[in-house]
Amino acid sequence: MSRTVFCCKLKQEAEGLEKQPFPGELGKKVFNEVSKQAWNMWLSHQTMLINEYRLNLIEARAREFLKEEMQKYFFGEGSEKPSGYKEIK
């Protein structure tokens, strides 16, 4: 049986993640407050950020940027798309 959480992004009860996505306090918070659907939405947004900003995830500052954007996406004012970004349809 899957677990449910009150998702901070979707503002409703939804299926929760199966395991903590990464270690640490932020990982625990995501596990407890973010649904599987919202996590998948973040993964798509994160991929767009990596590609548009040409982030090199070997660099600590790129990983820190993504961590900050994730906090904004789920728990803050929201993560913005890069200026000039146009979605492919």
UniProtKB/Swiss-Prot annotation:
Gene Ontology molecular functions: iron ion binding
Signal peptide: none
UniProt GO cellular component terms: cytosol
Highest taxon above the source species: Bacteria
GO biological process: cellular response to oxidative stress
Pfam family name, one: Iron_traffic
Stored InterPro entries: Fe_traffick_prot_YggX, Fe_traffick_prot_YggX_sf
Entry keyword set: Iron
Family: Belongs to the Fe(2+)-trafficking protein family.
PANTHER family: FE(2+)-TRAFFICKING PROTEIN-RELATED (PTHR36965:SF1)
Free-text function comment from the UniProt entry: Could be a mediator in iron transactions between iron acquisition and iron-requiring processes, such as synthesis and/or repair of Fe-S clusters in biosynthetic enzymes.
Protein name: Probable Fe(2+)-trafficking protein
Organism of derivation: Legionella pneumophila subsp. pneumophila (strain Philadelphia 1 / ATCC 33152 / DSM 7513)
